[in-house]
């Protein structure tokens, strides 16, 4: 937790005083004695994970192939190919199970 000096706006440091710890400013003579335990927790809001494959819309007009699903053993899967690495390496094939109850995704 970072507190700022009300006089000059610089960050306050914690130092030992004669009777207790205190917040003190290195620039001006401002001092604030700490009389109780000071805690403050803030949890950042996590943003939603972006679907790098474009979400559900990316799978609307793709072809299917005879690739069995490793999860439910359905005999067909939708597929698309994307260039995920440098141009001199082969494209990565992404699969999605054709079984609507499964929908498992994997890559080759």
From Swiss-Prot:
C4-type zinc finger span: 5-28
Give the transmembrane region(s).
none
Q: Where does Zn(2+) 2 bind?
A: 69, 72, 98, 102
Please indicate which superkingdom the organism of origin belongs to. Eukaryota
Q: Where are zinc fingers of the kind TFIIS-type found along the chain?
A: 65-107
> InterPro entries from the entry?
DNA-dir_RNA_pol-M_15_CS, Rpa12/Rpb9/Rpc10/TFS, Zn_ribbon_RPB9, Zn_ribbon_RPC11_C, Znf_TFIIS
Show the Pfam families listed in the entry.
Answer: Zn_ribbon_RPB9 (PF02150), Zn_ribbon_TFIIS (PF01096)
UniProt KW Metal-binding keyword? yes
Q: Where is this motif: Hairpin?
A: 88-89
Where does this chain mainly localize?
nucleus
| Compartments (UniProt record) | Nucleus
Q: Which family does it belong to?
A: Belongs to the archaeal RpoM/eukaryotic RPA12/RPB9/RPC11 RNA polymerase family.
The text the record gives for the protein's domains is: The TFIIS-type zinc-binding beta-ribbon domain contains an acidic hairpin motif (residues Asp-88, Glu-89) that likely coordinates the nucleophilic water and magnesium to cleave the scissile phosphodiester bond and release the mis-incorporated 5'-ribonucleotides.
Q: What does this protein do?
A: Core component of RNA polymerase III (Pol III) which synthesizes small non-coding RNAs using the four ribonucleoside triphosphates as substrates. Can mediate Pol I proofreading of the nascent RNA transcript. Anchors into the Pol III active site to constantly monitor transcription fidelity, cleaves mis-incorporated 5'-ribonucleotides and restarts the transcription process. Once Pol III reaches the poly(dT) termination signal, can induce Pol III clamp opening and transcription termination.
Q: What is this protein called?
A: DNA-directed RNA polymerase III subunit RPC10
Question: Source gene?
Answer: Polr3k
């Amino acid at each position: 937790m970072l507190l700022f000096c009300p006089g000059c706006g610089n960050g306050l440091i914690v130092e030992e005083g004669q009777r207790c710890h205190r917040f003190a400013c290195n620039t001006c003579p401002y001092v604030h004695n700490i009389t109780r335990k000071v805690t403050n927790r803030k949890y950042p809001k996590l943003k939603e994970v972006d679907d790098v494959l474009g979400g559900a819309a990316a799978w609307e007009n793709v072809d299917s192939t005879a690739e069995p699903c490793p999860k439910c053993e359905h005999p067909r899967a939708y597929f698309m190919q994307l260039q995920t690495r440098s141009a001199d390496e082969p494209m990565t094939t992404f699969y999605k199970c054709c079984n609507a109850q499964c929908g498992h995704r994997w890559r080759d």
